[in-house]
């Protein structure tokens, strides 16, 4: 059974305590009414994993846990089997005592692009919106964050996160809540807020930017990573039924247009930190994610286009400050 009591106890003692006015009731309602049909199967996989405290833990350069003496073949097989019960694994990679989870996305590459542009994370309280399996939460802790909180309504991601946490010695510096950003009150409590790979899924992208702003303390930093297209500050792609086979893609602005949106929402010191094309080396099918991936979503005769004829995915990182 996945519980949230440790998180409630933690925030009761800090500047997030006002969240307790709404959060426990929301989680209780989720537990009663909204659990996925496979949630019990997934949470059982977490429950059956052994609790291991790493002898060596590296969250600075990767998410890697090692034991002082190698685990037995039987222990490794048990861990491997239980983690495979939580497939597909999309965000990673993770190296856990000799079990290497080769995820669909090389999320470490994204982190390497983002990290040099961030304010120092040491001692910060961080929110990661749409955090997936929580890979970047652990990297934030590795970079010195005091507390990293992720929100993502996808329940498989919650179970993947809790599985990794259990294998990292039940580390309580990072937490994942099965909520969407629209369920959060205006907490105004986080030093840094990340939204990576979310904006293009929002029907109202400016509303999403306002929601992110409402979570930041004054002088807090927003890190926004999303799909973009080439163009000037007035360029926005509005795809038809699908974009790269995804149905729920609504608006893909140019990076200059996105900068303008952020300024319109009251952010300052907005800068475009990075723009890069997504490659089939960064997003691909693996034995831990066996269905279609980026290579299947691109035009086989022109890899600069999606199968629908739109520009192939490229992603930008923008950094902004809430005054």
Swiss-Prot record:
Amino-acid positions noted as binding carboxy-S-adenosyl-L-methionine in the UniProt annotation, renumbered to this chain: 91, 105, 110, 130, 152-154, 181-182, 196, 200, 315
Enzyme Commission number(s) of this protein: 2.5.1.-
Gene Ontology biological process terms in this record: tRNA wobble uridine modification
UniProt-listed CDD domains: AdoMet_MTases
Keywords: Transferase, tRNA processing
Family annotation (Pfam families): Methyltransf_9
Swiss-Prot/TrEMBL catalytic activity: carboxy-S-adenosyl-L-methionine + 5-hydroxyuridine(34) in tRNA = 5-carboxymethoxyuridine(34) in tRNA + S-adenosyl-L-homocysteine + H(+)
MF annotations from Gene Ontology: methyltransferase activity; transferase activity, transferring alkyl or aryl (other than methyl) groups
Protein role: Catalyzes carboxymethyl transfer from carboxy-S-adenosyl-L-methionine (Cx-SAM) to 5-hydroxyuridine (ho5U) to form 5-carboxymethoxyuridine (cmo5U) at position 34 in tRNAs.
Record note on quaternary structure: Homotetramer.
Entry similarity comment: Belongs to the class I-like SAM-binding methyltransferase superfamily. CmoB family.
Name of the featured protein: tRNA U34 carboxymethyltransferase
Protein's organism: Salmonella typhi
Gene this protein is translated from: cmoB
